[in-house]
UniProtKB/Swiss-Prot annotation:
O-glycosylated. One of its GO terms (cellular component) is endoplasmic reticulum. It is a single-pass membrane protein. The chain crosses the membrane at residues 72-96. SMART domains: SH3. Required for cell fusion. Negatively regulates Sho1p signaling to ensure efficient cell fusion. Interacts with SHO1. Residues 436-512 form the SH3 domain. Keywords: Glycoprotein, Membrane, Phosphoprotein, SH3 domain, Transmembrane, Transmembrane helix. GO terms for biological process: cytogamy; maintenance of protein location in cell cortex. This is Nuclear fusion protein FUS1. The lineage of its organism: Eukaryota, Fungi, Dikarya, Ascomycota, Saccharomycotina.
Length: 512
């Protein structure tokens, strides 16, 4: 294919050259005569016709195939060539970079200078760029050889990694000083003239250390850890039990914020006069509180009004009424005055006598609640009495226990006056008798349920009261149901149904 392309190109160039030569000669001859120009043109046409036509057309037909093949070859080969060329550039770059790092940090030798050894070990490519540098540094190599000869290292397997330095500066001897002593005479406390020469023998050093740390430490005094006995206190001292003051107060004079934690500057010693001169607590330190045992507190130490303030409500009435002669509370030996029983008045309750819980030392009696209802015709004058009955003990009590119980009873009476118990709320009905359990009532007003536990009742229906509440709501069961009464447990989910539920008590009236 390449030979055909070359042959076609040669043929075309030859034809063009022949045509240009012929045209030039014809142009010159046309100036002389016009007749000769016609003959020249005819000759040109004849020469062109005489050219083999099959060769020209075959070359022209083969030309598109050759151009398409070259285009495909360039489109494939050009990217591959560019990629290979770039890869070659990258490899050369990394190679030069690695050599530059090794040039800046060559391996160190003990006998040969650094630059000379590196110039010897580099390859021909590196020496090509760094030859001038090695030649310039060779002049300084002779000057450095003497230094390396002076510090000749042991080469081979016996080479050591230890480096020795020659220091001409004198060594300053070490010394230990106490805070209150000077540098010139650090061991004056021992009474011996000990030198600080570093050449002192080891035996003397051991003696100095032992004396300084254990035998005679400076500014430290032995303190006895014994505490004074109870007989040494000023309040318990007698003429025969006089003793001298503690040795601690004569020797110790150090003050610190932590002294009170070690019983050195605390107020404990000050209270009993054990430390009046030397034991001093800093003024800025907080004072410790005096400790007093509960068994030694006098009766008037606490103020009763401060411990138990009056918490009575100002809106309540307080009228002291005497007790009846036959009251069961008076059976306790008449230890409680009548004025300590408090009564309260309310619109619905004529008189409620509140008494404290029965408290007998070591036992708790059963508490009962008595409620008296009058006839429903006189419901406006009903009286409710709540009494807490305190039974007498079965066994006779000792005098001390009786006295203790009387004091406790008085204390409870005081509490009952200062902190009265709340009253039980009472339901109100508009002049009607209270609802009684187990009786049948008539519905006088329709009611539609609003909650899940309520039922619908209509005017004229008969219901039976099962339970009542202080707010006026009642649990009822319809009596005129066709299904009859269903006995279901209270814990069962079917206990509340369409015929058994909650209704307001105002919608009910007693059935005659």
């Amino acid at each position: 294919m390449v030979a055909t392309i070359m042959q076609t190109t040669t043929t075309v160039l030859t034809t063009v050259a022949a045509m240009s030569t012929t045209l030039a000669s014809n142009y010159i001859s046309s100036q002389a005569s016009s007749s000769t120009s016609v003959t020249t043109v005819t000759t040109i046409a004849t020469s062109i016709r005489s050219t083999p036509s099959n060769l020209l057309f075959s070359n022209v037909a083969a030309q598109p195939k050759s151009s398409s093949a070259s285009t495909i070859g360039l489109s494939i080969g050009l990217p591959i060539g560019i990629f290979c060329f770039g890869l070659l550039i990258l490899l050369c770059y990394f190679y030069l970079k690695r050599n530059s790092v090794s040039i800046s940090n060559p391996p160190m030798s003990a006998t040969i200078p650094r630059e000379e050894e590196y110039c010897r070990r580099t390859n021909w490519f590196s020496r090509l760029f760094w030859q001038s540098k090695c030649e310039d540094q060779n002049s300084y190599s002779n000057r450095d050889i003497e230094k390396y000869n002076d510090t000749q290292w042991t080469s081979g397997d016996n080479m050591s990694s230890k480096i020795q330095y020659k220091i001409s500066k004198p060594i300053i001897p070490q010394h230990i000083l106490t805070p209150k002593k000077t540098v010139k005479n650090p061991y004056a406390w021992s009474g011996k003239n000990i030198s600080l020469d570093p050449k002192v023998n080891e035996m003397e050093e051991e003696k100095v250390v032992d004396a300084f740390l254990y035998t005679k430490p400076p500014n430290i005094v032995h303190i006895e850890s014994s505490m004074p006995s109870y007989n040494d206190l000023p309040s318990q001292k007698t003429v025969s039990s006089k003793k001298t003051a503690l040795k601690t107060s004569e020797k110790w004079s150090y003050e610190s914020p932590l002294s009170r934690w070690f019983l050195r500057g605390s107020t404990y010693f000050k209270d009993y006069g054990l430390s009046k001169t030397s034991l001093k607590t800093p003024t800025g330190a907080p004072q410790l509180k005096q400790m007093k045992m509960l068994s030694r507190i006098s009766k008037g130490y606490f103020n009763e009004s401060d411990i138990m303030p009056d918490e009575r409500s100002p809106i309540l009435e307080y009228n002291n009424t005497p007790l009846d002669a036959n009251d069961s509370v008076n059976n306790l030996g008449n230890t409680t005055p009548d004025s300590q029983i408090t009564s309260y008045r309310n619109n619905n309750i004529d008189l409620i006598t509140a008494r404290p819980h029965s408290v007998i030392y070591g036992t708790t009696a059963q508490q009962t609640l008595e409620t008296n209802f009058n006839d429903h015709h006189d419901c406006n004058k009903s009286t409710e009495k709540h009494e807490l009955i305190i039974p007498t003990p079965s066994k006779p009590l000792k005098k001390r226990k009786k006295r203790r119980q009387s004091k406790m009873y008085q204390h409870l009476q005081h509490l009952s006056r200062s902190k009265p118990l709340p009253l039980t709320p009472n339901s109100k009905y508009n002049g009607e008798a209270s609802v009684q359990l187990g009786k049948t009532y008539t519905v006088i007003q329709d009611y539609e349920p609003r909650l899940t536990d309520e039922i619908r009742i209509s005017l004229g229906e008969k219901v039976k009261i099962l339970a009542t509440h202080t707010d006026g709501w009642c649990l009822v069961e319809k009596c005129n149901t066709q299904k009859g009464s269903i006995h279901v447990s209270v814990d069962d989910k079917r206990y509340l149904n369409e015929d058994r539920g909650i209704v307001p008590g105002d919608c009910l009236q007693e059935y005659d």
